[in-house]
A protein has these predicted regions:
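Non-catalytic beta/alpha edge segments that cap or flank active sites
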Residues: 1-111
Length: 111
């Protein structure tokens, strides 16, 4: 992870799995310490959208995102459905420079 966020050619990192509550689920704790800024709205929006798909089970997701060295990092649940939801309904548009009114692209190339 440290190599990726140090690489000027990598602007986005997607991590899947480890966002639940079992003893093996430590992705948010391991990755969030690297964040310069957390994208609080990502987890909130992901759970809101997921609620429409899986109901209250979404409360078990600890999906997080943040910026580390001008790289945006998304920590997603391990299920393919959750990854698809995050990509199609949140991440893809935020990585599109033409998406309005705002997107993440300018934050990825400022350094």
């Amino acid at each position: 992870m440290s190599k990726w966020i140090a690489d000027k050619n990598i602007h986005t990192v997607l991590i899947t799995g480890g966002t639940g509550f079992t003893h093996r689920d430590s992705t948010p704790e391991a990755i969030s310490v690297l964040f310069d800024k957390e994208v609080d709205g990502f987890g909130e929006l992901f759970r809101q959208i997921s609620y429409e798909e899986i109901g209250t089970s979404t409360i078990q997701s600890r999906a997080v995102a943040g910026f580390a060295n001008n790289t945006v990092v998304f920590c997603l649940p391990g299920s393919t459905g959750a990854c698809r939801t995050a990509w199609e309904k949140i991440i893809a548009s935020q990585l599109d420079a033409d998406f309005r009114p705002c997107n993440f692209v300018k934050h990825l190339v400022e350094a």
